């Protein structure tokens, strides 16, 4: 009986070793437990019938569903790991809402910066654009506040202060008069001497005077010719008188037929020549 059990145990160990090389490591614990159950059952059974029972129980114990369940879990685990490796981490909402001075966005070939304004949270692609935008925030705003009004009741001043105030009043009135004179000069009205029209500038008055000049020149042709003829006759008379006067100045009252006196020749050369008012006539018996 003991020999039979030893043979069955050796056969089982050979079967277990052969199966262990083909199966995975995870199912080894189950095989060992199955082997212990087989050995316990084989001790109660005897002969060739016991060996068949051991082999049937072992085959039933080491069944395919158990191995498929183990491999399915490992496959699920591997799939989960692959999905985690391929997945991307989504940014949290806190990082999206946080303000950044600038952030770098890199691409395959180039990279650029985004600059954000701290006041209005606008973004710009360059620092120069951000500087120009910041200048709009720094512009001085027009103050709408009214000036403080002086109190109605002023404290009483001394005599010296009153004198100074009167002096300031006089000087202020003089300045006001000078300013009014300047304004009057600036607003001087130019008046036409012919028709009395008033103009604010000398250029306008000059343009107006041209009308009067053109009106004077546009006279009737008959009156114009009469006036021209009268003017021409007067001018001719004046010209003739002028010519006669010039001729009298050129020709002296000298008679060349009179001989020079001998006494005058003996005198000095620098003595002036004297002419008689009524020269004597030669060969005149009257």
Curated annotation (Swiss-Prot):
InterPro entries this protein is in?
A: Znf_C2H2_sf (IPR036236), Znf_C2H2_type (IPR013087)
Concerning Pfam families, the annotation shows: zf-C2H2_6
- Extract the PROSITE patterns matched here: ZINC_FINGER_C2H2_1, ZINC_FINGER_C2H2_2
GO biological process entries = regulation of DNA-templated transcription
Q: Name one GO cellular component term.
A: nucleus
In residue numbers, the region (Disordered) covers: 1-28, 40-60, 131-171
Q: Where are the zinc fingers (C2H2-type)?
A: 115-137, 190-212
What does the UniProt induction comment state? By gibberellin and H(2)O(2). Down-regulated by ascorbate.
Tissues with expression: Expressed in flowers and siliques.
Q: What is its main location?
A: nucleus
Q: Where in the cell is it found?
A: Nucleus
Query: From which domain of life does this come?
Result: Eukaryota
What's a single GO MF annotation on this record?
Answer: zinc ion binding
Q: Which residue intervals are annotated with compositional bias (Polar residues) in the record?
A: 154-171
Q: SMART domains from the entry?
A: ZnF_C2H2
**PANTHER family from the xrefs?**
ZINC FINGER PROTEIN ZAT5
Function text: Probable transcription factor that may be involved in stress responses.
Protein name per Swiss-Prot or TrEMBL: Zinc finger protein ZAT5
Organism name: Arabidopsis thaliana
Gene designation per UniProt: ZAT5
């Amino acid at each position: 009986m003991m020999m039979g059990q030893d043979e069955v145990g050796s056969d089982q160990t050979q079967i277990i070793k052969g199966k262990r090389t083909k199966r995975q490591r995870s199912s080894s614990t189950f095989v060992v437990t199955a082997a212990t159950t087989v050995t316990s059952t084989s001790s109660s059974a005897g002969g060739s019938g016991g060996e068949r029972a051991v082999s049937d129980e072992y085959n039933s114990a080491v069944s395919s569903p158990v191995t498929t369940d183990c491999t399915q879990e490992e496959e699920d685990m591997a799939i989960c790991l692959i999905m985690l490796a391929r997945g991307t981490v989504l940014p949290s909402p806190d990082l999206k809402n946080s303000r950044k001075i600038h952030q770098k966005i890199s691409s395959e070939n180039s990279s650029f910066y985004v600059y954000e304004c701290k006041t209005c949270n606008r973004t710009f692609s360059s620092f120069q654009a951000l500087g120009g935008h910041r200048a709009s925030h720094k512009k001085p705003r027009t103050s709408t506040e009214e000036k403080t009004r002086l109190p109605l009741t002023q404290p009483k001043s001394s005599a010296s202060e009153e004198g100074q105030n009167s002096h300031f009043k006089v000087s202020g009135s003089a300045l006001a008069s000078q300013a009014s004179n300047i304004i009057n000069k600036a607003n001087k009205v130019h008046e036409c001497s012919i028709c009395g029209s008033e103009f604010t500038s000398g250029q306008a008055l000059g343009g107006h005077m041209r009308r009067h000049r053109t009106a004077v020149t546009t006279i009737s042709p008959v009156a114009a010719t009469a006036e021209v003829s009268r003017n021409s006759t007067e001018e001719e008379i004046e010209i003739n008188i002028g010519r006669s006067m010039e001729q009298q100045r050129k020709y002296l009252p000298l008679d060349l037929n009179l001989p020079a006196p001998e006494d005058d020749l003996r005198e000095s050369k620098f003595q002036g020549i004297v002419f008689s008012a009524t020269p004597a006539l030669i060969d005149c018996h009257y």
